[in-house]
Amino acid sequence: MKGKVWKFPDDVDTDIIIPGRYLVMRDPEKLREHVMEGLDPEFPSKVKPGDFIVAGKNFGCGSSREHAPLALKGAGIAAVIAESFARIFYRNAINVGIPLLEAPGITEKLNEGDEIEVDLDRGVIIRGDDEFPFKKLPDFMVEILEKGGLIPYLKKKGDFKG
């Protein structure tokens, strides 16, 4: 995965990722139009498919809503790389097919606009000649992500009758 870095602070909550007034929407493409607008109203028009969000601690805190990772998916975010994540957001994002990569100290190493590559197999973020490690995902989570999320994963395994 290769793309541009968009940087955000600590404690970005789900209401910032997608404001509550848009919870009537379920379509990721519609949610995309409002993703992160609380911090950067122009973000939806600037972000490109394959870009990365790099954030501080506790990304995805606040309300437990699937709309937040769906909005990121609709925006084409390749992965969110953060110092740490809120636990429920972490599972919701994996379930909809968004990789979340925990990389302590990453906000000191990457800048907005950096072009990076993420190597999930090696567990590294690459910027030019520099490599920064992240906590590798468990194999079962990688499988879920490779299938596009939990429901496609279960359908392919034959464990989902829906």
UniProtKB/Swiss-Prot annotation:
Entries under InterPro entries matching the protein: Aconitase/3IPM_dehydase_swvl (IPR015928), AconitaseA/IPMdHydase_ssu_swvl (IPR000573), IPMI_Swivel (IPR033940), LeuD (IPR050075), LeuD_type2/HacB/DmdB (IPR011827)
Enzyme class: lyase
Transmembrane segment boundaries: none
Catalysis performed (reactions): (2R,3S)-3-isopropylmalate = (2S)-2-isopropylmalate
Coiled-coil stretches: none
Enzyme Commission designation: 4.2.1.33
Pathways involved: Amino-acid biosynthesis; L-leucine biosynthesis; L-leucine from 3-methyl-2-oxobutanoate: step 2/4
Keyword Amino-acid biosynthesis recorded: yes
Keywords: Amino-acid biosynthesis, Branched-chain amino acid biosynthesis, Leucine biosynthesis, Lyase
A GO term, aspect molecular function: 3-isopropylmalate dehydratase activity
GO biological process: L-leucine biosynthetic process
Role, per record: Catalyzes the isomerization between 2-isopropylmalate and 3-isopropylmalate, via the formation of 2-isopropylmaleate.
Annotated NCBIfam families: LEUD_arch
Listed HAMAP family: LeuD_type2 (MF_01032)
Family of this protein: Belongs to the LeuD family. LeuD type 2 subfamily.
Quaternary structure annotation from Swiss-Prot or TrEMBL: Heterodimer of LeuC and LeuD.
Name of the protein this chain belongs to: 3-isopropylmalate dehydratase small subunit
Encoding gene, per UniProt annotation: leuD
